[in-house]
Amino acid sequence: MRDAVTTLIKNYDLTGRYLDRNAMDELKAYFESGSARIAAAAMINANSATIVKRAAAQLFEEIPELIRPSGNAYTTRRFSACLRDMDYYLRYASYALIAADNNVLDERVLQGLRETYNSLGVPIGPTVRGIQIMKEMIEAMAEDSSLNSTDFIASPFDHMTRELSELSV
């Protein structure tokens, strides 16, 4: 798992360059946004169960066939697996927020996930929608909590959505 600083330094090191003005600006932005990123992650940590529960309720309201007989979230086991996966995406999104780098999502979440879901018959569309619902909830919570900057919140969720989607969203 890398953060924005490690990634930046690695890229400059690979090309044998000193950190230039652009690198310094990126570092400055990273450190200036640190408090907001920590506050957002703390907000997610404190409300994770509620976020997952409400996001799942909204998802099943939007796509009720998921919880009907023969739906992918029908039966307690499948429903629990759905909630577990949503919690997993949320937890790793919080790690990516702190790091200001989506690399952890590629390494720990996304690598092979679409193929696994396809082989198990888990529909990707509702998964993507569930991730987006959580993003929308967290953005609303961040605005309500008066976080100074919330621009960074969408990044990990949109990254997962893009990578999981068959089509560009």
From Swiss-Prot:
The keyword Membrane applies. One of its GO terms (biological process) is photosynthesis. Coiled coil: none annotated. One of its GO terms (cellular component) is plasma membrane-derived thylakoid membrane. It is found in: Cellular thylakoid membrane. Transmembrane segments: none annotated. Pfam families: Phycobilisome. Contains one covalently linked bilin chromophore. (2R,3E)-phycocyanobilin binds at residue 82. It is a peripheral membrane protein. Gene3D superfamilies: Phycocyanins. The modification N4-methylasparagine is found at residue 72. Disruption phenotype: Increased levels of photosystem I (PSI), decreased levels of phycobilisomes (PBS) and photosystem II (PSII) per cell. Cells are unable to undergo state transitions. When combined with an ApcD deletion mutant the cells have decreased PBS, PSI and PSII, and require glucose to grow. Keywords: Antenna complex, Bile pigment, Chromophore, Electron transport, Membrane, Methylation, Photosynthesis, Phycobilisome, Thylakoid, Transport. InterPro entries: Allophycocyanin_b, Globin-like_sf, Phycobilisome_asu/bsu, Phycobilisome_asu/bsu_sf. NCBIfam families: apcB. A variant beta-allophycocyanin (AP) which forms a complex with ApcE, a phycobilisome terminal emitter that influences energy transfer to photosystem II. Belongs to the phycobiliprotein family. Heterodimer of ApcE and this beta chain. This is Allophycocyanin subunit beta-18. It comes from Synechocystis sp. (strain ATCC 27184 / PCC 6803 / Kazusa). The gene is apcF.
